[in-house]
């Protein structure tokens, strides 16, 4: 996997309307590109402005946490962001892909969203999200946290063909059960 570090200009995207599927007003991608390498990914088809080969090369927004702090701060000079769900992850890159183990941008972003009382909705295919159960429980108590997993199939063999870089469905289903037992709303699609 190739890793490229960049300085981003902004991190949060405001949707024109609240996303009816993910109930989010804002979205963010801490990484561009995704090492999960799912064959059906729309990011692969669209290219999503990824340098290098989609599915193998990942761009890391190394200043994402500084930008997020500035953007979430209610004292900012521009119009402050309304407290509404922030969608973490999506088509441009899974926030819990393998590079997250090294950079921990997602965990740091969650800590900031907790500090500023923003609810979160995380879309992932990775069981690495279990690492952050402590901060997700705090966010859930304060404002709300939702964890969603996507599946191409619940058959481990079929999934291995279409989603070669992700944990098998049985592990993702166990992770959903884990979060449900922790009192965090979960979904799958």
Task: Mark where each language-model region is.
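Conserved Radical SAM active-site core
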Residues: 1-148, 152-160, 169, 173, ...
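Gly/Pro-rich active-site loop or hairpin
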Residues: 166
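Short beta-strand/loop segments at the ligand-binding rim of alpha/beta enzyme cores
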Residues: 181-189
């Amino acid at each position: 996997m190739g890793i490229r570090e960049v300085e981003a200009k902004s991190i949060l995207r405001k949707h024109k309307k609240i996303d009816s599927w993910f109930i989010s007003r804002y979205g963010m991608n801490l990484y561009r590109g995704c090492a999960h390498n799912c064959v059906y990914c729309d990011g692969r088809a669209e290219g999503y402005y990824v340098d290098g080969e989609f599915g193998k090369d990942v761009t890391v927004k190394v200043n994402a946490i500084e930008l997020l702090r500035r953007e979430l701060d209610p004292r900012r000079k521009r119009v402050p962001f309304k407290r509404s769900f922030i969608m973490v992850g999506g088509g441009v890159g899974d926030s819990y892909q393998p590079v997250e183990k090294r950079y921990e941008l997602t965990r740091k972003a969650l800590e900031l969203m907790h500090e500023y009382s923003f609810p979160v909705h995380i879309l992932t295919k990775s069981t690495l999200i279990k690492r952050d159960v402590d901060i997700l429980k705090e966010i859930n108590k304060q404002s709300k946290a939702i964890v969603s997993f996507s599946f191409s199939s619940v058959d481990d063999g079929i999934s291995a063909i279409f989603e070669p870089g992700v944990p098998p469905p049985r592990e993702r289903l166990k992770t959903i059960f884990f979060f449900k037992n922790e009192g965090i709303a979960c979904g799958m699609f």
